[in-house]
Each structure stands twice: as structure tokens, then as C-alpha cells.
């Protein structure tokens, strides 16, 4: 499955989990949301963040789901381990300070 379709499934499932209609989401038109959920459009990062937060889920949860669709449970666990490890490594090389 393509990442675009995984993201589409994740957005649709998260919205349904929260019991929100496409019209009720209020951040984009129903037509645009439908195209996203069918995998016909890909949102910008900012729009993806806005939609996920309007649904009430963290954007990384939807993105993680998009990568995990179709994996076996142990593969999903391993994916989580890899992500945590890579984040730790990236943090070590982030030279900017807040």
C-alpha cells in the first residue's frame, strides 16, 4: 500500500473514531477532505497538522498508522523501536538550541 493511501486510511479512521463528520470538521471543505480520505490529494504538512489536531489526534499518530498499515503486530512494535532510537540519534545532532 502506498503511503498516500495509508495516510488517507489513517485520517478517515481517526475522524470516524472521534465521531466527526467531514462537514463537522470545520478546517477544510468536505470535497477536499473526501479527496484526502480517498488518497486523491496529499495535504501539506501544515494542513495535515491542522486537520489531525481538529480531529483531536496527534499528527504523528496518523502518520505512524500510515506506515504501520498492513504490518504484523511485531513489525509495528519494531517500527516504534526504530523511530524512538532514530529520534534519540537525531536529537544528539540537533545543534540549534531553544
Model-assigned labels for residue ranges:
Residues 1-17:
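A short, Lys/Arg-rich alpha-helix, primarily the initiator
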Residues 6, 28-31, 43:
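Alpha-helix N-cap/N′ positions at the starts of helices
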Residues 11, 22, 30, 45-48:
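Helix-turn-helix DNA-binding elements, focusing on the entry/boundary residues of the two helices
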Residues 40-53:
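Short, basic-rich loop-to-helix N-cap that marks the start of a DNA-contacting helix
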Amino acid at each position: 500500500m502506498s503511503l498516500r493511501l495509508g495516510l488517507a486510511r489513517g485520517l478517515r479512521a481517526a475522524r470516524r473514531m472521534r465521531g466527526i463528520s467531514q462537514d463537522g470538521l470545520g478546517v477544510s471543505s468536505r470535497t477536499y477532505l473526501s479527496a484526502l480520505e480517498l488518497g486523491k490529494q496529499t495535504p501539506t504538512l501544515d494542513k495535515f497538522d491542522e486537520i489531525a489536531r481538529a480531529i483531536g489526534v496527534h499528527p504523528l499518530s496518523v502518520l505512524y498508522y500510515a506506515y504501520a498499515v498492513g504490518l504484523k503486530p511485531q513489525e509495528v512494535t519494531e517500527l516504534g523501536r526504530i523511530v524512538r532510537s532514530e529520534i534519540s540519534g537525531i536529537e544528539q545532532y540537533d545543534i540549534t538550541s531553544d
